[in-house]
Design a protein with these regions (language model features):
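Short amphipathic alpha-helix adjacent to the substrate-entry channel of hydrolases
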Residues: 90-110, 130-131
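Short acidic, Pro/Gly- and aromatic-enriched capping/linker segments at domain boundaries
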Residues: 2-17
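N-terminal cap/lid segment of alpha/beta-hydrolase-fold proteins
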Residues: 18-71
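Primarily recognizes the serine-hydrolase "nucleophile elbow" in alpha/beta-hydrolase
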Residues: 131-188
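Conserved catalytic-core motifs of eukaryotic protein kinase domains, centered on the activation segment
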Residues: 87-91, 120-122
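Short beta-strand element of the alpha/beta-hydrolase
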Residues: 71-83
């Protein structure tokens, strides 16, 4: 065996490989794409925000092309799939999907980037997504210390929706059950 070769301690084909030194190699997934202003195909703008500096939970916000009608838009808090261990809110496929979804649904979207397994085991993803929902709801009272203008200026906090695919659907269920048991800030 090559002295420089690392030994595999666990594999989850075709998704990932974990080495004895703790390195995680993700075998599938699409690459990172930056946020865009005025996507050429949809007119949707996006930007990245840090929700929690302590846990590094972040999100990509999406805003549809604005019309002269300044009516506030529904909010979609979206959780990605990927078996809790692959993909990202910043991946090409998910970015493309959210651009189309936001354009068609005419919503402000918050696409949560939660920490992935196996580095961060459940319930970390649930807690990260709950923190993101609390962050969104904290904007319902206006411009606080950590406010995001796309939410305070364009979002209707009487119309918040949760969505997700695959593992994200599981997170939607968990977060909705938690919202029933615990109150969100400002009674949302």
């Amino acid at each position: 065996m090559d002295s420089g070769a690392q030994r595999v301690s666990a594999e989850l084909p075709p998704l990932l490989r974990v080495y004895e030194d703790g390195l995680v190699e993700r075998l599938v997934g699409s690459g990172f794409v930056p946020a865009t202003l005025n996507d050429p195909q949809t007119g949707v703008s996006s930007k990245d925000v840090l929700i929690s500096p302590e846990s590094a939970v972040s999100a990509r916000l999406y805003l549809p092309k604005l019309t002269c009608n300044r009516r506030k838009l529904p909010i979609l808090v979206y959780f990605r799939g990927g078996a809790f261990c692959i993909e990202s809110a910043f991946s090409f496929l998910d970015h493309r999907y959210l651009n189309i979804l936001v354009n068609e649904a005419n919503v402000v979207a918050v696409f949560v980037e939660y920490r992935r397994a196996p580095e961060h085991l459940l319930p970390v993803a649930y807690d990260d997504c709950w923190a993101a929902l609390e962050w969104v709801s904290s904007h319902s009272v206006g411009r606080g210390a950590n406010y995001e203008p796309w939410l305070t200026d364009y979002a209707d906090f009487d119309r918040i929706f949760l969505g997700g695919d695959s593992a994200g659907g599981n997170i939607v269920h968990n977060v909705a059950m938690r919202a029933r048991a615990q109150s969100l800030p400002h009674n949302l």
